[in-house]
Amino acid sequence: MVSGLFGWTVLVWSLGFAAQVVSGPRPLEGTYWKAIELQGKQVPARDSIREVYLVLAERGRLYGSDGCNHVAGAYELKNGSVRFSEMAATRMACIDAGDIDVAFREALKSAKRVTVAGEHLELFDSSNRRVAVFLAASSHSADPAKR
């Protein structure tokens, strides 16, 4: 009884934290991809910014967050190449976001190729330079202010 109650307490307590990493190969589409590197720099895990993530949804639509604003747009996949277009974002002022939002948008703008290896999604530009790395996560942050 006590161990069962403890298990539920830990489960409920852990649901309030940011995305948890999932193991095993993940599909490119429909997976919550949490940004861990943008333009060669690690994405900091700070409480003051929203989680930076990307979801490639059905019918070529995408949504996510650049660390400050919600983003949405379109994507096209063809033989390992990727093209992001019709990008739109909210226009909130985020003092603590630094340049993460700019790095996220630039990574999507310059991406030409995509690979998925296990739990990682990587975007590469036309010079085959890696511009972003994302990690598959089971869900987004339970805190709406962080989404």
Language model features: what each stretch is:
Residues V2-W8, V12-R147:
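Lipid interaction determinants
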